[in-house]
Amino acid sequence: MFAVIRTGGKQYKVANGDVIKVEKLVADAGATVTLDDVLMVSDAGKTTIGTPVVQGAAVTAEVVAQSRGPKIIIFKKKRRQNYRRKNGHRQDLTVLRITGIQA
């Protein structure tokens, strides 16, 4: 059984036991979160596609950790003007372990 969920503006295909990194969710490590934005559920060949979400479907997950992504370097330059700007960014992420899919 798997589902397609939407969180943080992105879509993820998940199954029981999967570990995924999503955009930061406000929850402590060890907490349980419920993701209600389920776009599709498939179970033993029976597929349900939502319009836009599947009614009554939910995915439960356990928060494993709050982490940060890799550092992205932003470098701006204008030639011949001695204009250089260097900036860095690390995105806050939440690591989730999928514990259940209810269709």
UniProtKB/Swiss-Prot annotation:
Keyword rRNA-binding: yes
Recorded superkingdom: Bacteria
Coiled coil: none
GO molecular function, one term: rRNA binding
RNA-binding found in the keyword field: yes
Pfam families registered for this protein in UniProt: Ribosomal_L21p
Gene Ontology CC annotations of this record: cytoplasm; ribonucleoprotein complex; ribosome
InterPro entries recorded: bL21-like (IPR028909), bL21-like_sf (IPR036164), Ribosomal_bL21 (IPR001787)
Keywords: Ribonucleoprotein, Ribosomal protein, RNA-binding, rRNA-binding
Gene Ontology BP term (one): translation
Complex formation: Part of the 50S ribosomal subunit. Contacts protein L20.
Family: Belongs to the bacterial ribosomal protein bL21 family.
PANTHER family in alphabetical order: 50S RIBOSOMAL PROTEIN L21, LARGE RIBOSOMAL SUBUNIT PROTEIN BL21M
Function: This protein binds to 23S rRNA in the presence of protein L20.
HAMAP family: Ribosomal_bL21 (MF_01363)
This protein's name: Large ribosomal subunit protein bL21
Encoding gene per record: rplU
